[in-house]
């Protein structure tokens, strides 16, 4: 890449970054937080944060990258995607009408809410316990990270339930919403994330997500400033780099350490070059249609229920890894959101996907606002926990693609909804057995005086 070519790419990158950052800033000034702000920051991180890192790798370490015209296509496709997404998100689908009382879909009380977070936490802890009994601490047993996907590791399906510890702790926080509950959320979820990091053998997702939710709650409540958020972001990048070194068993120093930091940080936070690789091989892609979305559900079907279930699922990530990169190491390389759309239907699917994503984020913001307006604090805690708990799925959306997002968000909704139903059933059983005693003002006054 020549300096002239780099200059052209830099101008396009700068314009796209300023365009998205400006719209995000105006939205932040208007509402302080919603899921459009979160997704916009996540989109910036995924598709534009990596460009400076790639540039340093090219000019400092002479690393090979896709041709400049392909990198230009990647930047422009990301910018156009966001423009279509933003217009879709801001388009009002129906006339604003005055709020009229409606019969609520469901209600929550104190006991049901506490039962819900206990069940969610129980699912996570029991899953971790069973996985640990089968495999021990994989971080200290395995020689390479790719081995966690091998037949040596049993009970892999249990990992999908680990994440429900975070929604459980979110319910606990939203019931109190003070600084102590905020700090308790951080300590408990990061401690759980470090435990799963050691047990699973290097998975950092729970730590990243817990830290991100902690920061956004702090921004919403005014407990941290934007400068503190930026400093925490830098600290998070350094922390993820250190965990990656431990995961891969790397011991580096000097120029090698700087080089390793650049490419690991790029691959962890901003795999935008993967989109460029897909565009470079565009003519060789056999478009998969909507099949990757259907196939991604296969991993949630137990083998005893479907004996002939394919052991290897050809979703967009695996198609990119196996067919485009010819990589059969056992790891799935993230194709990114736009890359998954390219695998499914080529360039035509990019604006269509942007419209779908705009509607998805719009739905989450509708739920979030519903929680903000809800007078029942127990129901509000459940709604907010669901919305913030889905942040993991939004990260999957940006990094892994639309197919992975759909299967995971459906799984999340089913498990979360099942926990709600079980909590309500248990409450009904306890109440029928006479074990539930409603609090009254007189009893509370007696307790205080005693």
From Swiss-Prot:
Provide the family line.
Belongs to the WzyE family.
Q: Its annotated pathway?
A: Bacterial outer membrane biogenesis; enterobacterial common antigen biosynthesis
Alphabetic keyword roster? Cell inner membrane, Cell membrane, Membrane, Transmembrane, Transmembrane helix
Q: What is the lineage of its organism?
A: Bacteria, Pseudomonadati, Pseudomonadota, Gammaproteobacteria, Enterobacterales
Q: What is known about what this protein does?
A: Probably involved in the polymerization of enterobacterial common antigen (ECA) trisaccharide repeat units. Required for the assembly of the phosphoglyceride-linked form of ECA (ECA(PG)) and the water-soluble cyclic form of ECA (ECA(CYC)).
NCBIfam families reported in the protein's UniProt record: PRK02975.1
UniProt GO BP: enterobacterial common antigen biosynthetic process
Segments spanning the bilayer are 6-26, 37-57, 63-83, 118-138, 155-175, 181-201, 207-227, 228-248, 341-361, 378-398, 410-430
Q: Which organism is it from?
A: Escherichia coli (strain K12)
What is the protein name stated in its UniProt record? Probable ECA polymerase
**Where is coiled-coil annotated?**
none
Subcellular location(s): the record lists:
Cell inner membrane
Q: Which gene encodes it?
A: wzyE
User: What do the Gene Ontology cellular component annotations say?
Assistant: plasma membrane
């Amino acid at each position: 890449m020549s300096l002239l070519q780099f200059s052209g790419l830099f101008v396009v990158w700068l314009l796209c970054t300023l365009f998205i950052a400006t719209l995000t800033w105006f939205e932040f000034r208007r509402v302080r937080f919603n899921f459009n702000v979160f997704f916009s920051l996540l989109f910036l991180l995924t598709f534009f944060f990596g460009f400076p890192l790639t540039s340093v790798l090219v000019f400092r370490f002479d690393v090979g990258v896709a041709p400049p015209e392909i990198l230009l296509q990647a930047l422009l496709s990301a910018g156009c995607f966001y423009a279509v997404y933003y217009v879709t998100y801001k388009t009002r689908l129906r006339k604003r009408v005055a709020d009229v009382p409606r019969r609520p879909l469901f209600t929550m009380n104190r006991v049901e809410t506490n039962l819900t977070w206990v069940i969610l936490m129980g699912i996570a802890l029991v899953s971790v316990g069973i996985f640990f009994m089968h495999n021990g601490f994989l971080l200290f047993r395995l020689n390479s990270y790719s081995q966690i996907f091998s037949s040596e590791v049993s009970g892999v399906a249990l990992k999908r339930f680990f994440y429900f510890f975070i929604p459980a702790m979110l319910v606990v926080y939203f019931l109190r919403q003070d600084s102590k509950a905020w700090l308790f959320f951080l300590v408990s979820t990061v401690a759980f994330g470090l435990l799963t990091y050691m047990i699973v053998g290097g998975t950092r997702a729970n730590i990243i997500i817990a830290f991100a939710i902690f920061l956004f709650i702090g921004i919403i409540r005014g407990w941290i400033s934007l400068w503190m958020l930026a400093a925490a972001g830098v600290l998070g990048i350094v922390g993820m780099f250190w965990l990656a070194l431990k995961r891969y068993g790397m011991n580096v120093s000097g120029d090698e350490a700087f080089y390793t930091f650049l490419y690991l940080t790029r691959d962890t936070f901003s795999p935008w070059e993967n989109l460029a690789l897909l565009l470079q091989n565009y003519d060789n892609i056999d478009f998969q249609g909507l099949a990757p979305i259907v196939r991604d559900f296969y991993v949630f079907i137990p083998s005893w229920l479907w004996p002939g279930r394919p052991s290897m699922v050809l979703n967009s990530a695996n198609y990119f890894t196996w067919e485009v990169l010819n990589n059969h190491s056992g790891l799935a390389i993230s194709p990114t959101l736009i890359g998954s759309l390219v695998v499914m239907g080529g360039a035509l699917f990019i604006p269509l996907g942007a419209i779908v994503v705009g509607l998805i984020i719009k739905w989450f913001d509708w739920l979030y606002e519903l929680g903000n307006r809800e007078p029942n604090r127990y129901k509000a805690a459940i709604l907010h926990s669901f919305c913030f708990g889905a942040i993991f799925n939004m990260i999957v959306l940006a990094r892994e693609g639309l197919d992975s997002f759909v299967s995971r968000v459906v799984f999340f909704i089913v498990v979360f909804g099942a926990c709600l139903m079980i909590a309500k059933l248990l409450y009904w059983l306890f109440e029928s057995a006479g074990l539930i005693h409603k609090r009254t003002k007189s009893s509370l006054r007696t307790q205080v005086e005693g």
